[in-house]
């Protein structure tokens, strides 16, 4: 594990997440009796999609490398473009020193900044290909065993306080019913579960929860507009080699 060496700030959902959603290519319907999933094209068609991993990576880059200064006046769009390019060019695995952070004047966090500059952020954070070509994607094609998920749960429990937020890949394979990235930023622990509080780029309105069940040694994710709920595989990404 290679956690950040810099002091970790507290991540706040209402301040440190994007105001706009990652859009769905399809709309999903889940049969309440059988659980069968059917899909149909979104109407109107989405304009910002296949970038969930771009968004979770960028969330961390702003958390690790930006310093928001609401007391200063906002700058022109051209300057905002330079700010965004600088932040998303930084290392998503390690925070910089406080003195090296990129100043973002006029806003108190990523949510207010992204509300004001949505088109710029979408244009500059990276294309859909960056969601497909992640060095960690090799892991999803190999079996994920319960003992490995137990280790992953404990790893996330240990690393989250050091990193400030952890990025994870949620998937089912070989039948790909989910292939998605979210941001973990909080943890509630009991004898039965590790309950991670998370930001889902598909659902910017409120936090979601990813649960590790100790008895079954599995991760579960609640039903949503794009996932029927249940057990899935979890791998931490943008962390240590080879992820």
What spans do the regions from the language model cover?
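Cys-His-centered catalytic/binding microenvironment captured across papain-like cysteine peptidases
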Residues: 2, 175-179, 188-243
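Cysteine-nucleophile protease catalytic domains, especially the papain-like/related folds used
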Residues: 7-146
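Residue-identity detector for glycine
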Residues: 35, 106-109, 126-127, 153, ...
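Context-gated lysine
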Residues: 122, 150, 155-157, 209, ...
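Active-site-adjacent substructure of cysteine-protease-like catalytic cores
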Residues: 144-189
